[in-house]
Amino acid sequence: MSLTELLVAMFIFTVVSMGISIFFANIWKSKYNELEMGKSLLIASQAVNNMKKSIRQAGQADSGAYLISSASNFDFVFYSDIDNDNDMEKIRYYLDGSEIKMEKAEPILGTNPTYPDVYEAPVTIAKDIANTETEPIFSYFDNDYDPLATPTSAYPIRLIKITLYVNTDPNKISDVSISSLVYIRNVNN
């Protein structure tokens, strides 16, 4: 084997090795992106289920306030006993950048219960949320299932639609949506 043949063989081996390495690296990266998207979807789905549970159980505040405090496209504040202590916590779900966060405020009990002006530290319940101004997280409906404009008065709200668009890489992957309807049980008609 001459030196020229040896160099050609080494060159071919190097090119083939690099090609195989690049091929497997791209497959790994693709599978990693799919795995990340799957994890984000699972977390978002769990967040929607937890939101549904707490919204469904909304009730009158310990202070006597109506069960819904405020309702807009990306922010929903209501009262619910999410920790099963027989006290109605003030709950706020909202979009902060690409994260859904939850805040709660425990009632200050006494002869005239009140709620503090400041919530406890926010908890991130979902990440990689890609909702835009035209894709609200919260949509509201009345008794006849007619949509309500937002922000809306809390009193006609009977049904809430929660929609999350999830995307781990907005430059490459299209949004995947998770949507659910919640009927508030404790609303007097």
Describe each PLM feature range.
Residues L35, A71, M102-E106, A154-I157:
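Calcium-binding acidic motifs and repeat modules
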Residues I68-N73, D96-G97, T152-P156:
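Short, ordered beta-strand-loop transition motifs
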Residues L42, I55-I82:
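Short, glycine/small-hydrophobic-rich surface segments
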Residues Q46-L67, K127-P147:
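Generic detector of solvent-exposed, compositionally biased contiguous segments
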Residues M1-Q60, N189:
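Aliphatic-rich helix starts adjacent to a transmembrane/signal segment
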Residues N84, T114, K127-N189:
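Short linear sequence signals and composition-biased patches located at protein termini or domain-edge surfaces
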Residues N73-D146:
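Type IV pilin-like appendage domain
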